[in-house]
């Protein structure tokens, strides 16, 4: 297995929260020899230099192995060169686009975002004892979030905001 936890601790990296998609993936996969788990969303949001990250973790890479990872950040494409350098050839991403299955030899697979309002006990009281198949749903959507056009892959959020 690729022991990244020591690096995460040493360099004070952390899993993003409350949307802990990468952390949940890490907890499920950390014992798999080919899983390369790092908090990519934090690396992006904290603007860590990718060359620095590469130099910190490259000793963990066995060039004979092909690794996989999970990235929950919408700007995942910026990591492609780093992932290639780390021999990561498969990435589970939360912002998978239909028809984009490979970028520069890296396979992209979908991974659901951690649903904070459902998965976290302190937020999910409204969902207890609900028959999700048959319940009437008077609300079309319950999450809008922010709208920063430069950050999104499509204009769906603009359409949601236009409906309000």
Please state what every model-predicted region is.
Residues 1-164:
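Nucleotide-sugar donor-binding catalytic core of glycosyltransferases
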């Amino acid at each position: 297995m690729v022991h990244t936890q020591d690096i995460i601790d040493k360099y004070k990296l952390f899993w993003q929260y409350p949307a802990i998609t990468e952390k949940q993936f890490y907890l499920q996969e950390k014992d798999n020899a080919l899983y390369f788990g790092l908090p990519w969303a934090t690396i992006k949001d904290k603007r860590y230099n990718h060359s620095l990250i590469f130099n910190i973790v490259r000793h963990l890479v066995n060039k004979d192995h092909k690794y996989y990872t999970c990235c929950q950040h919408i700007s995942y494409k910026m990591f492609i060169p780093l992932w290639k350098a780390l021999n990561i050839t498969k990435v589970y991403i939360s912002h998978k686009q239909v028809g984009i299955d490979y970028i520069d030899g890296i396979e992209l697979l979908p991974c659901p975002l951690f649903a904070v309002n459902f998965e976290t006990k302190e937020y999910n009281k409204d969902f207890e004892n609900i028959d999700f198949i048959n319940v009437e749903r008077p609300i079309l959507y319950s999450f809008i979030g922010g709208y920063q056009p430069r950050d999104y892959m499509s204009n769906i959020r603009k359409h949601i905001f236009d409906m309000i």
